[in-house]
Amino acid sequence: MAGDPRGFAPLEPARHRVGERTELYDGTVTVDHWFTVPIDHALGLAEAEAQDAAGTGVGPHGRGTLTVFAREIRAKDDPGGERPWALYLQGGPGSAGPRPARLSGWLGALAESHRVLLLDQRGTGRSTPATVATLTAPGAFATDEAR
C-alpha cells in the first residue's frame, strides 16, 4: 500500500517451499513449509534477496531475509488438505509450535474441521534463529528517520 505510515513495503507473497510430507502412526498427515521473508518490513522480497546476494542486509552475515517454518496438520480423513486453514500461534516468548505425535485434545478437535498451521514464529524452533548477532547487527533497529 503506497504511503503506508509505518514505512512497510507493499504487500507481496513470501517465497514458499513445501517440504516433507509425513504420515503419523494414527494416520495424521503433516507437511513442512518454509517461507522466506524480508527482515526489514520496509523492503520488498526482491530487495531483501538482493541484500542476501550482496551481503548488505541487517541480519547476520549481511542477510536481508529470514526463513519462517510452519508445520501443517491434516486429519487422516483430509489427506489432500481440502479443509480451510486455522493458524495456531504458540504463546511466548521463544517457544516453537507444538510437535504432535498424534491428534488429540484441542488439536484433534480443530483438525476435524480445519487444516492447522503450527507456526514457529521468527527466532523460534526451525525458523531463522534470533541471536546476539541478529539483534546487534548494525541497523537492526533503525528508525524511520535513519532510512
What are these model-derived regions, one by one?
Residues A9-E12, E20-R147:
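Gly/Pro-rich cap/lid or specificity-loop segments adjacent to the active site
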Residues M1-H16:
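N-terminal presequences and immediately downstream first alpha-helices
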